[in-house]
């Protein structure tokens, strides 16, 4: 990722601090990633919090929304492909923000950086909400007679345990945590499949074919789940044979879409209208696999804080006066990071509505990063070599991204406000 401090440079960000962050995002820092390794990296970047809400999204949008999931999978595969074409047109582009600069100059890079940081912030809020919800479910006896406050206290304790990780400057020592998404996905998928086969769960509730009024918010959840495009240019440049990048995208997105579809259908079929916005919270509490899934979902946010915060921390440190010593910068970075995480904790406890926040993030940020900007970059960089159909299609994708972003953000925000008013009696 690029830092905002380098936005004013007429080149990609090649600062010394950049290498560790890229290594955290992609394990292949050199141009030596095989096809299989690249697929694993891309799948790992795509799979995340979104998988928890797949059954909920189907319940909200109806069974027909599965086709929307598949359509977005195809669309975001295409936008991944055209990011590769943008890099081939300008080989100096090494990152998503470099492509933004190649297309729209300094303003393009600045816009990209702002969206990167906004996505990081909102993702951290979502992770913390997930931590709170699942840690409450992991200790049901503890909170059954004491209301919401004890759960909030334990969430605060969990965040406090993770706070010291924000003070680590060299994150390469914990880069193995970046593979946690794939492990969590395997555990959750295994738990859902086990419950479907052996759990004896039967739900008589009916899910409608289509709920058109919920499509904007459901679209946000689906798009959030396909939004890994920020690191795809780095993955492209790390490949031994970049000409296979499109095939990597097709295999990776097909794998993830199949996983999401299986989770969505299985979870929605088992729990029907009673399904929670996080599938782990709907699994039978007495099953051992449920406890494993809950703890996997609890531990994942705690391991993500340092990794997700790294780009923000780097920018904060670079913004400090050069006269400061390294020790003073480390302390300032740690204090600012801790303060930001406490703000995120407060926000997550104030607005603990995972599904709505995830939908808002997808509509406000992910659709821009995964659909609107890639098509806009492609139009600007490769306009001369496009057919009329390709130009029209990508112009349509830009418009579609803007429409989905506006409608989804409005609907998600409206639902959030409505829920807050209902809960707090305003």
Curated annotation (Swiss-Prot):
Identify the main location.
membrane
Q: Name one Pfam family in it.
A: Aa_trans
GO CC, sorted alphabetically, is:
organelle membrane
For biological process, the GO terms are: amino acid transport
- Annotated keywords: Amino-acid transport, Membrane, Transmembrane, Transmembrane helix, Transport
InterPro entries the UniProt entry points to: AA_transpt_TM
- Membrane-spanning segments: 34-54, 55-75, 110-130, 148-168, 182-202, 215-235, 248-268, 292-312, 340-360, 363-383, 392-412
Q: Does the keyword Transport apply?
A: yes
What highest taxon heads this organism's lineage? Eukaryota
Topology with respect to the bilayer:
Multi-pass membrane protein
Compartment annotation: Membrane
Q: Which family does it belong to?
A: Belongs to the amino acid/polyamine transporter 2 family. Amino acid/auxin permease (AAAP) (TC 2.A.18.5) subfamily.
Under what name is this protein listed? Answer: Amino acid transporter AVT1H
Species annotation: Arabidopsis thaliana
């Amino acid at each position: 990722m690029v830092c905002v401090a380098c936005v004013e440079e007429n080149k990609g960000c090649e600062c010394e601090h950049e290498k560790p962050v890229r290594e955290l995002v992609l394990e292949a820092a050199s141009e030596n990633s095989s096809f299989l390794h690249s697929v694993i990296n891309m799948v790992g970047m795509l799979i995340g919090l979104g998988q928890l809400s797949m059954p909920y999204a189907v319940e909200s949008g109806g069974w027909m929304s599965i086709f929307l999931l598949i359509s977005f999978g195809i669309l975001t595969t295409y936008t991944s492909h055209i990011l590769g074409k943008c890099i081939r047109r300008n080989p100096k582009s090494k990152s998503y923000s470099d492509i933004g600069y190649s297309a729209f100059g300094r303003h393009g890079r600045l816009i990209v950086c702002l969206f990167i940081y906004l996505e990081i912030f909102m993702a951290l809020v979502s992770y913390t909400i997930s931590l709170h919800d699942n840690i409450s479910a992991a200790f049901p006896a503890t909170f059954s007679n004491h209301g919401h406050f004890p759960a909030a206290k334990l969430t605060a304790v969990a965040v406090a345990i993770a706070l010291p990780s924000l003070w680590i400057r060299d994150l390469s020592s914990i880069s193995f945590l970046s593979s946690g998404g794939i492990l969590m996905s395997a555990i959750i998928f295994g738990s859902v499949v086990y419950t479907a086969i052996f759990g004896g769960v039967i739900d008589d509730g009916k899910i409608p074919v289509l709920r058109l009024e919920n499509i904007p918010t459901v679209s946000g959840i689906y798009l959030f789940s396909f939004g890994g495009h920020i690191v795809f240019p780095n993955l492209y440049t790390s490949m031994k044979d970049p000409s296979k990048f499109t095939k990597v995208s097709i295999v990776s997105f097909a794998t993830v879409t199949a996983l999401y579809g299986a989770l969505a259908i299985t979870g929605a079929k088992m729990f029907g209208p009673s399904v929670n916005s996080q599938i782990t919270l709907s699994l039978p509490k007495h099953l051992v696999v449920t406890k494993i899934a809950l703890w996997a979902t609890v531990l994942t946010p705690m391991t993500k804080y340092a990794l997700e915060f790294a780009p923000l921390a780097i920018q904060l440190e670079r913004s400090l006066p050069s006269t400061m010593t390294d020790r003073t910068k480390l302390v300032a970075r740690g204090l600012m990071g801790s303060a930001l995480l406490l703000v995120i904790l407060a926000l997550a406890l104030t607005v603990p509505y995972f599904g709505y926040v995830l939908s808002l993030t997808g509509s406000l940020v992910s659709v821009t990063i995964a659909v609107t900007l890639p098509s806009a970059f492609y139009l600007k960089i490769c306009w001369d070599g496009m057919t009329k159909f390709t130009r029209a299609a990508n112009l349509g994708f830009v418009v579609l991204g803007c429409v989905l972003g506006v409608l989804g953000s409005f609907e998600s925000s409206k639902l959030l406000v409505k829920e807050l008013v209902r809960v707090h009696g305003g």
